[in-house]
């Protein structure tokens, strides 16, 4: 297949290229266009504008994978509009291009944060009513909404001011196309510099984890499992729709730290400080504007479990190829290199 991938120089893009380049012909679309191993050519965003680069002069693409976007800023220093300009604006541009092109498949990388900032109940599934919090999740759901306004997903309908759109012409026009909205939870793997790397640096210094009394569960996404799912969406006849993505097993922060220490050959230092006492300290931190406050404590200790049953059923598999623990071990060992 000829595949166009946006955001190829990022963490996920680089790993996808390594996973796909052996059996597919890959093209890039990014804000920079240096040569990249495994990529035939990288186009710039202005190249897909028909006014400057007619679509007839571009290669024939069988599929488009849209990765480009602004990641969640954990320091909250980015202006809200930047998220919408990039996460929503670029999605509109590339999806419009997809609809006009001969490409048959479109994979959009959204996020579970487009669905919910916190999980209500035991597990987050695709049928949840989206309630994003903050510009990252809000810009992602806005991008999803744009896609649904212009393409009928098999398990969703689009709504505008309480009225359903009439899609008869579009259904006929785009009946040969398939569109997938992927909502992965936290992705990790070699080359990842996100939150997992921050926790790794704390553990590596031997700093004790004082929140061992909180037994939370969180879902993660191994980059190997993610690449496996993308390959499946590209090569199998999977129905268009929204799919959550995560490893089979959810891990507690205590288990995560233990796995990190195991990979580093260190003994874990997990302190089970009294839960009520830690909640009181966090409350005081809120009043005094200290690093550990009530909101940060909630984020560090809450459950965030994501179901992957729908995507596994769509691909016809019972389990992901990599278990959560093995994926974490591989990531941590890459930090050590």
Can you say where each PLM-predicted feature lies in the sequence?
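Conserved Rossmann-fold NAD(P)-dependent oxidoreductase catalytic core, especially the SDR/UDP-sugar
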Residues: 93-135, 154
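Mid/C-terminal beta-alpha module of Rossmann-like enzyme folds, strongest
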Residues: 236-292, 324, 329-332, 336
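N-terminal Rossmann NAD(P)H-binding glycine-rich loop of SDR-like oxidoreductase domains
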Residues: 3-22
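Conserved C-terminal active-site "lid" loop/helix of NAD(P)H-dependent oxidoreductases
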Residues: 223, 258, 281-318
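Flexible, glycine-rich beta-alpha linker
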Residues: 177-197
């Amino acid at each position: 297949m000829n595949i166009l991938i946006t955001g190829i120089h990022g963490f996920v893009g680089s790993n996808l290229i390594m996973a796909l380049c052996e059996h597919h012909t890959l093209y890039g679309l990014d804000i920079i266009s240096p040569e990249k191993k495994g990529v035939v050519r990288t186009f710039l965003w202005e190249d897909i504008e028909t006014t400057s680069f007619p679509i007839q002069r571009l290669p024939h693409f069988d599929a488009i994978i849209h990765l480009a976007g602004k990641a969640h800023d954990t320091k909250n220093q980015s202006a809200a509009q930047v998220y919408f300009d990039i996460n929503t604006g670029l999605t509109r541009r590339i999806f419009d291009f997809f609809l006009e092109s001969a490409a048959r498949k479109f994979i959009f990388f959204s996020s579970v944060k487009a669905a919910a900032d916190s999980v209500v109940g035991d597990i987050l599934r695709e049928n949840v009513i989206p309630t994003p919090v903050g510009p990252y999740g809000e810009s992602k759901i806005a991008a999803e909404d744009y896609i649904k306004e212009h393409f009928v997903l098999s398990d969703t309908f689009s709504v505008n001011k309480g009225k359903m759109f009439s899609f008869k012409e579009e259904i006929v026009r785009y009946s040969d196309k398939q569109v997938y909205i992927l909502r992965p939870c936290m992705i990790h793997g070699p080359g990842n510099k996100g939150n997992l790397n921050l926790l790794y640096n704390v553990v590596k210094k031997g700093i004790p984890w004082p929140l061992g009394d909180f037994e939370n569960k969180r879902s993660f996404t191994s980059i190997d499992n993610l690449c496996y799912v993308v390959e499946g969406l590209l090569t199998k006849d999977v129905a268009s729709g929204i799919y959550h993505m995560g490893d089979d097993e959810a891990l507690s922060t205590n288990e995560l730290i233990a796995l990190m220490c195991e990979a580093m050959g260190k003994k874990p230092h997990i302190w089970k400080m009294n839960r009520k006492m830690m909640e009181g300290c966090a409350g005081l931190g809120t009043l005094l504007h200290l690093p550990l406050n009530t909101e940060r404590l909630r984020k560090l200790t809450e459950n965030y479990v994501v179901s992957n049953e729908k995507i596994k059923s769509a691909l016809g598999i019972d389990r992901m190829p990599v278990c959560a623990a093995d994926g974490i071990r591989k990531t941590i060992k890459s930090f050590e290199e």
